[in-house]
Amino acid sequence: MNKLKTIFKKSVAEDDGQAAAEESAIRNPQSTIGAPRFLDPEVLARITSLELLARTVVEGFVSGLHRSPYTGFSTEFAEHRQYMPGDDLRYLDWKLLGRTDRYYIKKYRADTNVQCHILIDASASMRYTTTGVTKMQYAQFLASSLAYLATRQQDAVGLMAFDSEIHTHVPAQNRTGHLRTIFGRIERLVAGNETRLAETLHLAAERVTRRGVIVVISDFYDDPDAIIKALQHLRFKGNDVIVFHVLDKNETDFEFTEPVLLEDSETEEQIHVLPDVLADGYRNAVREHIDRLREGAAQNKIDYELFTTDKPLDFALFSFLARRARQ
């Protein structure tokens, strides 16, 4: 899979008009048709504060749920579980049934709070971009938004970031000021060294001491079988595991038309490539890699979602919220 770990070229987003863009993103969140503009990664890249970014994304996402394809689903479901035959009807939420035509049982507050551990791949390959938003930035946006959303649900949030080792670890807590600590650690992350993804996920599994939800955000450039075994380790302890596979669109589509020099972002090995010769084989290799990850995740009851860095964040937030509601 090393042939997939490539940095073709590094592009940098323009900083001009940054302050105006931040204000526009907040004041005019619905400035485009379709997905809310505040969920667009390129707009988010112009907001310098992760705390402001996360609050803007999550509050906009939650308020927009009733207008979305996910009609009838909202964060209140995190305090419910689906009705099962034999459940005491005294605890059926009749008001929710009337609004949504769905049968849910209320859960006590003590039963609804869980630990959410967010694991971020900060290896060198996460620097790659052709859209102006690197995979690392997208992971930071996503992790910050998930941390804010989990805190909004009264969950304890923890963070781990890794490349060849776990270099950042904030244990899960739910106390005043903790979310700001999480934001600060996420903001300081820099994509750096070579990764040993599977090995590091095994180490992360040993650090999670209480059952909860584990979110893994990575480009998953490692042997798929080794990755699945590591995810099984996370899952084995009774955790619900959500995999967010983040790639640049060009990594999946390989849209180069001219000869190009490819450089492995972690080993710095370079190779000259003729796109006409490589393109089909490359796309097939990527497709096979993704399919093996998706199938392995499904076999182990792990949620798998593939995102390119141009994709709005609402898809990821809904996936997280849906998994959280099953707790």
Task: Cite the ranges covered by each PLM segment.
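Von Willebrand factor
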Residues: H178-G212, P224-D225, D248
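Short, electropositive alpha-helical surface patch
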Residues: V170-G184, A322, R326
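An amphipathic, basic-hydrophobic helix/alpha-beta surface used to engage anionic
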Residues: N2-G17, G34-N174, V213-I217, D223-D225, ...
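Arg/Gly-rich low-complexity intrinsically disordered repeat tracts
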Residues: D16, S24-I33
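Thr-Gly-centered strand-to-loop micro-motif
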Residues: I217-S218, F307
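Von Willebrand factor type A / integrin I
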Residues: M1-A19, G34-P69, E79, E206-G212, ...
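Short, contiguous clusters of charged residues that form electrostatic/catalytic patches at enzyme active sites
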Residues: F141-S145, T195-H202, D225, D291, ...
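Conserved phosphate-coordination/catalytic loops
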Residues: Q137, A191-A198, Y221, N284-R287
